[in-house]
Amino acid sequence: RIMYYKIPTIVFLFFHIAFSETIYVPDDINSIQGAIDASENSDTILVDPGIYFENINFNGKSIVVSSKYLLNNDSLLIGITIIDAGNVGSVVTFNNDENSNTILQGFTLQNGNGNNEDPDDNGSFYTYGGGIYCENADPLVKDCIIQNNTANEGGGAGIFCFDSSPAFIGCIIKGNETDDVGGGLYARDNSSPSFSNCSFFENLAEFGGGCYLKSSS
């Protein structure tokens, strides 16, 4: 007689569990960009009030970067948590396929003068996006003041969008200036930025002081 035995098979499944972390600036890392560089997707970066003289790039990460406004909705924190580019480059850059899981909230963005970019890839470089430069990206920007930025010989002093559809909620775009187009906003090449409860005022440009749209909506 032949005996058959069933030998149980045990399968072990190993799961990688990702835990989100909160990084505090300047307590943990003394610069916002340094915190972004150290972060992983789903992390939150909380920034104390102060003036941060730097330019930041989200580098495609799905993270939240916020002032302490995130904790208590105290609007006074927006005006005293400042990212200041010191008239060197764009204050904030999104150009690595960021989406709505990339969130910037509760800052004043000021004194950017645009970058030196060629989004058309035709060898012509211009200064775009003093406050925010957005190329091939769809981030979410909430409760920010975008002010006193420039972008001469290009445009989009406050915000520049190229093939991008960022969403802006509760933002103020004011006092931005360019001798080209789009003092507050310059959106082009299939861009569809959206604005909810936002205000544009005292923005200046040769054409389109508030906004200038080209092949965009």
Q: What residue spans do the PLM features occupy?
A:
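Hydrophobic h-region of N-terminal signal peptides that target proteins for export
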Residues: 12-20
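Short, Lys/Arg-enriched N-terminal segments with co-localized hydrophobic residues
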Residues: 1-2, 16
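Right-handed parallel beta-helix
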Residues: 44, 67, 80, 101-113, ...
